[in-house]
Amino acid sequence: MPTTTPSPPPKPSHYTRPLRPMGDAPKGVITRVSGPVVEARGLKGALLYHVAWVGPERLIGEIIRLAGDVATIQVYEDTSGLKVGDEVWDTGAPLWVELGPGLLGGIFDGVQRPLPLLTQPDDQGRPQEPYIARGVILPALDRQQRWPFTPAVNDGDHVEPGDLLGTVPETPHFHHRILVPPDYPPGRVEGLRSGEFRVREVIGHLIPDNGGPRRPLRLSHRWPVRKPRPIRRRLDPNIPLITGQRVIDTLFPIAKGGTAIIPGGFGTGKTVTEQSLAKWADADIVVYIGCGERGNEMTEVLVEFPELKDPRTGGPLMHRTVLIANTSNMPVAAREASIYTGVTIAEYFRDQGLDVALMADSTSRWGEALREVSGRLEEMPGEEGYPAYLASRLAGFYERAGLVETLGQEPRQGSVTIIGAVSPPGGDFSEPMTQNSLRLVGAFWALDVNLARRRHFPAIDWIASFTHYHLDDWFRDHVDALWPELRAQAQRLLQEERELEEIVQLVGSDALGDPEKVILDTGYLLREAFLQQSAFSDDAFCPLEKQFFMLRLVLAYHGAVKQHVRSGRCTFDQCIQESAPIRRSLFRLKEMTLDELRAAFPDLLAQIEHWSQGRH
C-alpha cells in the first residue's frame, strides 16, 4: 500500500500569509542542513530569491542558489531540529514587505513580523513565549483597523504609476498618501470611494489602457525587498540633512539623499550617535534598523522614543519612526533581510515625496552574516573571510539612497539618506567592511578611541573624517554669508593644532612661541566649547543659527588674541588672564537656548571687538 506524505500542520487563523496554497506549491526534500543554510532536492521550477517554507514548522527561508533541481536556502529562523528528509515548499513569491497605513510607530523583525503582536495570546488564549516562536507568520499591518480614506481623484480620471489616489490621516501630524502601485499600468480609475477601510479591502479599481484585466486598488500593496522601487530620475543632492550635531552640520555635512558611515571601535559612541541622528535629524520619516546589535540598545530606543517630542511637529517621536529590530541573538541570515526590509520601507515613504533618514546599526553585523553564510556554502573566501561579492552587496544597498523625482503625472521630490554604523574589529579602519563602504559613501565620520577615552563626544575625528557634499551655497543663502569662510577657518585651525600637538609631545609647550600657543588655545576652545556636545542634555540638538553664533564668537575671540600677540601689545599669558570673563562666556554658550544666544550675541561680539581694540 503506497505511503502518503503528511501535509504540514495548519497554522492558527491569525498566522496566515497570502501566499500560494501548499497543495499547489512545488515540493522538495531536505538533503543537507548546515546552520542557517539548507539544501533541498526536487524544487523544480523554483526561481532565485523565491521564499521557501522549510520543514514541518514552515520556517521562512529564501532560495539563494540553484543547481539543477537542488536549491540552497538561507533560513531566517532557527534551524534546530530540522533533519534530512523534511519537506520544503516553494511559495512562488519573492520576499516582500507590506506597505501601507500602520507602518509608522511599528516595531518589526527582519522579515516584517510585528513584534508587539508576538506577545499577545494566540487563538486558544495561550500566552506566547518570551522569544519569537519558530514558524510564526503574522501580517505586518493590522488587518482589523479601519482607516479613513479621502480620494484625491474622481471616477474616470486617468492615472499612472505613482499618482496620488487619496490620503489617510495615520497620525495627527501625518497624512499617509495612497499611490498607484509602481508595477500597475496606466489606466482609468473606476469605483474609487471614500470611507473607512481595512488595509486589504478594495477601495476601487484601475482599468488599464492596454485592455488588460482590471486591477484592484487597496490602501496597501506589496513590494519585493531586493528590487529597488522605480523613480523618474535622480537629482543632485544639494540640501543638507540638519542633524543638530555641530561637528557634523558645520564640518562634515551630509545632503538629503546622501550616504554616510560611522566607523568606530568598541565604546566610541556609534549607537548613541545613530540614536541622536534618529531623534533630531530634520527628516520626515526615520527608519531605524538594529541589525545584529545588543537587545538592550533596541530597548533603549523603545523606551526613549515614545517619551520624546518631535521638534518639528510636537508629537511623539515614534509617530515618525519605523523600527526594524534584529538583535544579535536572532538568526544571522535574517540580518540581510532586515537591511533590505528597512530600505524598501524607506523608498516607499520617499515615493510619497518625503525625506527619509535610514539608520543601519550596524552594517558590520550584516557583513558577518554574509561571511558565515558564505562559509556554509563553501564559497571561495575573499579578504579576511568575507565573500568576494561583499562590495557589490554593499553597493546595492547604498545606491538605493538618493534625492529623486518620483513617478507620477505630478512628480514629487523625495529622498532616502542612509547612515550606516560600521564596527571594525579593534578599531582597524583597513578591514574590508570599512574600506568597501568608504568607496561608496559621500561622508565619512570616523570615531576616535582616544577622543572617547577623554570623554569627548561625539568622538568624531575632525582630521580623519571628510564629506564630499558641497553645500556652501545653501549655508551661505540660508544661514549666513560668512558660514563657508568660518567653516574653512575652523578646519584649518584644528589641522594646525593637531600638527602642533605632535611637537608639544616631543619638546613640551614651553618651547612654542606665542603665535603657536594662540593656535593651540583656539583648538582647545573649538573642541571644548563648540565640538563637544552631550547627547543627554538640552544641548543634544543645536540649530544651525546657534551653531553660527557660537563659531562666530569663538573665531572672533581667536582673531582678537592673535592681533594682540602679533602687535606685541601683550604676551599670550597676559591675553588669557585679561580675557578671562570672555572665555567664561564662550564656554557657557552651549548652555544657552537659541533665543538667549540670539539676544546676547551682539553684546558678546561687541565685547570681544572692544577688547581687541583696547585690551580693556
Where are these regions (language model features)?
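Short, surface-exposed secondary-structure edge patches
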Residues: 40-45, 76-81, 96, 104, ...
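Metallocofactor- and cofactor-centric catalytic cores in central/energy metabolism, strongly enriched
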Residues: 69-71, 93, 183, 187, ...
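P-loop NTPase nucleotide-binding/switch module
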Residues: 121-182, 187-189, 198-259, 273-276, ...
